[in-house]
A protein has these predicted regions:
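Membrane-interface amphipathic segments in extracytoplasmic regions
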Residues: 1-227
Length: 227
């Protein structure tokens, strides 16, 4: 997790890769500068917590770790994905991907998009914030955020598609795909729960254990893959 800091208004946003970060950055820079910003990725996004965190209202945008890894796997490791070149095996399955992930050496699995949300610049002192809100990316309270800034977020920002979204395909799969080569199901709608048998669920839970604990403390129950 990194932080977008509005020092003037004492508001910060916590973001992590594959947790709607492009969407959140667009919102933040509009609210901070009162204009739509087309440049949303850069060094200015990777901040630590402010030293006077107790004066800040903090908004964290999170994602179910079970869903986040599936989303990253399908987006970044598809045949044309930006990190597929890191994969050294002849075939790619979700089960094998998780195996490489939990090894933790980050040779074949790109770290920034798959490290736990409670790593990078995450700091437990965030709990000292004057006020802290944590929203799942599917359930962001935009009204609350607009009220903090006393401004309406344009629909062009709220509805903008960033290009990483999965398409809605004409056919769906409702059986386990964890041991299948990705190309066998990529062009189908596949629910996140279809990627998990009990063994994989336990491996992913243990790897992202601190995420599950932290978000549970903030009222989000991520103990099962999406349905």
């Amino acid at each position: 997790m990194y932080f977008l800091v509005d020092a003037a208004r004492k508001i910060l946003f916590g973001w992590s890769a594959k947790c709607g970060c492009s969407h959140i950055k667009r919102i933040f820079y509009f609210l901070k500068n009162r204009k739509e910003n087309t440049i949303i990725h850069g060094d200015k996004d990777y901040n630590k917590l402010p030293r006077d965190i107790e004066k800040y209202t903090t908004i964290i945008i999170s994602r179910n770790p079970y869903e986040r890894i599936v989303s990253g796997f399908l987006d970044k490791y598809k045949p044309s994905g930006s990190f597929r070149h890191l994969w050294k095996h002849d075939t790619i399955t979700f089960a094998k991907f998780v195996e490489e992930l939990v090894r933790g050496d980050w040779n074949m699995v790109e770290k920034h998009h798959f490290t736990p949300q409670t790593t990078e610049q995450f700091d437990e002192n965030i709990m000292l914030s004057k006020c802290i809100k944590c929203y799942d990316i599917k359930d962001i309270d935009y009204t609350y955020i607009e009220e903090l800034y006393n401004v309406k977020i344009p629909e062009t920002i709220l509805n903008k598609r960033e290009g990483h979204e999965r398409k809605n395909y004409s056919e769906s799969i409702d059986h386990l795909v964890c041991d299948l080569e990705m190309t066998q199901y990529y062009n189908f709608n596949v629910n996140s729960k279809c990627f998990y048998n009990e063994e994989l669920k336990n491996k992913v839970h243990n790897f992202y254990k601190n995420d599950f604990i932290f978000f549970s403390e903030l009222g989000l129950d991520y103990t099962t893959p999406g349905v």
